[in-house]
Amino acid sequence: MAFMGIVARRSPPPGILAMTDTLHASHAAGSAISAHAHTDAASRDAALARRYGAEAVPPAGPWNATIAGLLDHRSVRGYRTNDTLPAGTLETLVAAAQSAATSSNLQTWSVVAVDDRAVRADLAKLANGQAHIEHCPLFLVFVADLSRNRRIGERGGATLAGLDYLETYLVAAIDAALAAQNAVIAAESLGLSTVYIGALRNDPARVAALLGLPPGAMGVFGLCVGRAADGAAGEVKPRLPQPAVLFRDRYAAGGEAELVAAYDPRMEAFSRRNEMSAARWTTRVIARLADAAALSGRDRLAAILRGLGFPLR
């Protein structure tokens, strides 16, 4: 109908309007998803290139923030001075650690948070003078601990002869490692940095004495946790190409020499950029494992463990 020269226009039915709005919203959402997927792909490719080198990036696969955080891991040996962590950080990390898998739910590990500065200084000294043990705001010693289960047996009138075997010690060491790695992942998700201290195994008996560990308990490694000092984080360290460690159905070392030869210069370049020893990775492997002396006292570990209450039958 026309009135005064103006043509009256009919409005679209409500259903058509709703459909149009839905299509516009779907298009916008699709564009956002596409952009997000593109960003994720770029993030994934960059992270894999940092970890393996651009020449050895494995095939693309699923990706999320958790995987991105894992690939961004690096050991940090410099921490902010006089720093403190938020209240509850220790307990949160231990909750994450206790959420790791544990063989048969035996829970054969414990952890000691070391605050005593004199004890930290002694631990740093036996660990080849690693000063970050003294300076980090949180230092943990993860313990392969069969003593708790031994006490459970004693209270129940059982001797638990199964605790005396190498297998059970191995379970405890693995439990401690799994727990610690969960703690590391949790710490890094909170923006904290970490470094493991395997050099505590230079003198496990001294570590046990310093921490008051009972027989059947051994400090397998330490862990520094804190906020990285400026410039301390460094780069992500390259790893061996996946075909050097990933096999399908059967172990196959046929192409290993070529893969390791390709990795050596990548690791050498990383070391030069980060002001480390420029020796090739293979050279370091040979030096680190050349003889008993290269183990810094750890060649006596079996005897020391027996002295700490692990018969290792």
Which ranges hold each PLM region?
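Acidic, surface-exposed loops and disordered segments
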Residues: A2-R313
